Amino acid sequence: MIPGELFTDGPEHVLNPGRRAHTLAVVNASDRPIQVGSHYHFAETNGALGFDRAAAKGMRLNIASGSAVRLEPGQQRTVELVDYAGDRIVYGFRGLTQGAL
């Protein structure tokens, strides 16, 4: 096994099937790399990341659980976000939501 390798039951595994997805352009305006984990409320990420935060409310990265996206200083990239599932209640992170989405 290779570290980080995923074993699936078929040739292709679809992450988060049936959830609303949204694509956003994100730019790192800081002088340091910024990494965002798979389940972090994307609207509450580091303030040095430039993107439409209102469009990202209630969403997280559409990547495998436990993985992350890293943006180097000045880097712009496109990310795909998906809605949080379950009760859609968010606490913590940067403290901007603190309750129901």
Swiss-Prot record:
* The protein's annotated pathway: Nitrogen metabolism; urea degradation; CO(2) and NH(3) from urea (urease route): step 1/1
Coarse class of the protein's main subcellular location: cytoplasm
Q: Where in the cell is it found?
A: Cytoplasm
List the catalysed reactions.
urea + 2 H2O + H(+) = hydrogencarbonate + 2 NH4(+)
* Signal peptide range: none
Would you say which domain of life the source belongs to?
A: Bacteria
Look up the record and give one Gene Ontology term from the biological process aspect: urea catabolic process
Output the Pfam families linked to this UniProt entry: Urease_beta
This protein's GO cellular component annotations are: urease complex
CDD domains annotated for this entry? Urease_beta
Q: What is its EC number?
A: 3.5.1.5
For this UniProt entry, the molecular function terms from Gene Ontology, in alphabetical order, are:
urease activity
Q: Which keywords accompany this UniProt record?
A: Cytoplasm, Hydrolase
Q: Describe its partners and assembly state.
A: Heterotrimer of UreA (gamma), UreB (beta) and UreC (alpha) subunits. Three heterotrimers associate to form the active enzyme.
The protein's matches in PANTHER family, at most eight in alphabetical order, are given as: UREASE (PTHR33569:SF1)
Family, similarity comment: Belongs to the urease beta subunit family.
- Which HAMAP family does the record cross-reference, listed alphabetically? Urease_beta
- Report what the protein is called: Urease subunit beta
- The organism encoding this protein is Albidiferax ferrireducens (strain ATCC BAA-621 / DSM 15236 / T118)
